[in-house]
UniProtKB/Swiss-Prot annotation:
Chief location: mitochondrion
Presence of keyword Metal-binding: yes
Binding site for K(+): N120, D185, S221
Protein name according to UniProt: NAD(P)H-hydrate epimerase
Family annotation (InterPro entries): YjeF_N_dom (IPR004443), YjeF_N_dom_sf (IPR036652), YJEFN_prot_NAXE-like (IPR032976)
Biological process, per Gene Ontology: lipid transport; membrane raft distribution; negative regulation of angiogenesis; nicotinamide nucleotide metabolic process; regulation of cholesterol efflux; sprouting angiogenesis
Biological source species: Canis lupus familiaris
Compartments where located: Mitochondrion; Secreted
Segment annotated as transit peptide: 1-48
Sites of N6-succinyllysine modification: K144
Length: 288
């Protein structure tokens, strides 16, 4: 409880927010099998066994991922908020399959969702809202909020669902390990370029010291979109959106899901994505 008192003493919660102490959950995970590996049984959390993903599933470069997005918006007239809602729901669904509430040590399981300033952060806000509906207790840290109606609305939706927002990031990994059972990395997406600046440099440094598992949305934050990890965070769960990116070939965590079941068949054919068949009405597909 000393760590919790220290955290509360720092005034890390925004007004009206509450945090619960949740014992740490070991997050050191063995390297997962290759994404094209055949179906295999799986025990404990993680939902259904991994499917048989075709070896031809395409891993996109940054340029290809941007081109697909542009066509979705321009040619197919999808709106940003529409795709964000579908992506965020996919992320929450993948998390619920990898870490079912019944497999966690506390009820409801406490989850910290860290959101960046762009669309990846918006996906995280939507994900947090659905996690609340799925039986988790999310808390959001959103240090750089865009002054745009879409993101303001997403924040309001979360607040109306009694999802607390932190005023500051817990400064030590052990505090996060004590308070949460899972951290969702919704900081940077595939369009990120350049050096990581504050406050996100410090945030990623803290995340790198966690023992609780990290679930990264689309790209593990701090990774090069094509080359992969350069000594940054090591997520336990990766949720690729639309199609996997080239950096995902360097992913060694336990769970890799594909989400975002919204790609029109003609667009999939044009870019030769060769996406795997989603089962029944599922919005996610387990690649690993």
């Amino acid at each position: 409880m000393s760590a919790l008192r220290a955290l509360l003493g720092l005034g890390l919660l925004a007004a009206g927010s509450r945090l619960r102490r949740v014992p740490g959950r070991a997050g050191a995970c063995p390297a997962g099998s290759a994404w094209w590996e055949a179906r295999r049984p799986h025990s404990g959390g993680g939902g259904e066994p991994a499917g048989m993903a075709s070896p031809a599933v395409k891993y996109l470069s940054q340029e290809e991922a941007q081109a697909v997005d542009e066509e979705l918006f321009n040619e197919y007239q999808f709106s940003v908020d529409q795709l964000m809602e579908l992506a965020g729901l996919s992320c929450a669904t993948a998390i619920a399959k990898a870490y079912p509430p019944t497999s966690m040590s506390r009820s409801p399981p406490a989850v910290l969702v860290i959101c960046g300033p762009g669309n990846n952060g918006g996906d995280g806000l939507v994900c947090a809202r659905h996690l609340k509906l799925f039986g988790y207790q999310p808390t959001i840290y959103y240090p750089k909020r865009p002054n745009k109606p879409l993101f303001t609305a997403l924040v309001t939706q979360c607040q109306k669902m009694d999802i607390p927002f932190l005023g500051e990031m817990p400064p030590e990994p052990m505090l996060i390990d004590e308070l949460y059972e899972l951290v969702v990395d919704a900081i940077f997406g595939f369009s990120f370029k350049g050096d990581v600046r504050e406050p996100f440099r410090t945030i990623l440094s803290v995340l790198d010291g966690l023992t609780v598992p990290i679930a990264s949305i689309d790209i593990p934050s701090g990774w090069d979109v094509e080359k992969g990890n350069s000594g940054g965070i090591q997520p336990d769960l990766l949720i690729s959106l639309t199609a996997p990116k080239k950096s995902a070939t360097q992913f060694t965590g336990r769970y890799h899901y594909l989400g975002g079941r919204f790609v029109p068949p003609a667009l999939e054919k044009k870019y030769q994505l060769n996406l795997p068949p989603y089962p029944d009405t599922e919005c996610v597909y387990r690649l690993q």
